Amino acid sequence: MMKFFEYNWQVRDQWFTWCHQLTTEELLKNRLGGVENILYTLFHIIDVEYSWIRAIQGKEDIAVQFADYQTLNKVKSLSNTFRTEIIDVLQTHSDQIKDELVSVPWETGVLYTRDEILHHIIAHEIHHIGQLSVWARELKLSPVSASFIGRTLKPIHSY
């Protein structure tokens, strides 16, 4: 599972680099499909990842407002800031605690295992990154490669 977090983070960082070719206006332009626009999609991925990780830790969810992150650099900085805490959770995940039950503040009376949550985080990011690829092609630009094969992944602990 760790390899998929490494993959997602590498692809996310490549999308941040890819986004530098667009203006802030283009990044914020509402589009068909997905969640509004390119910048908000990246923000949403980061926000959801962090909310689930905090739930695993038994911590209160922090409501991060997109209005405070209206530039590419601010969203990238948010991603980097949250990774520190996320790394701690990922490095302590093991087979012994993967079935530990977690409640989330946004769903009353529902429990998930740590393992389910981590798999959901991975799938959620891959899903939304796919939408970025669609929008890139609509802009007549090449998207970031989604291929897992042939990547040299940076270990989680090195972020």
Swiss-Prot record:
SUPFAM superfamilies: DinB/YfiT-like putative metalloenzymes. Keywords: Metal-binding. It comes from the Bacteria. The keyword NADP does not apply. Transmembrane segments: none annotated. InterPro entries: DinB (IPR007837), DinB/YfiT-like (IPR034660). A divalent metal cation binds at H44, H124, H128. Gene3D superfamilies: dinb family like domain (1.20.120.450). GO terms for molecular function: metal ion binding. Belongs to the DinB family. PANTHER family: DAMAGE-INDUCIBLE PROTEIN DINB (PTHR37302:SF3), SLR1116 PROTEIN (PTHR37302). This is Uncharacterized protein YizA. It comes from Bacillus subtilis (strain 168). The gene is yizA.
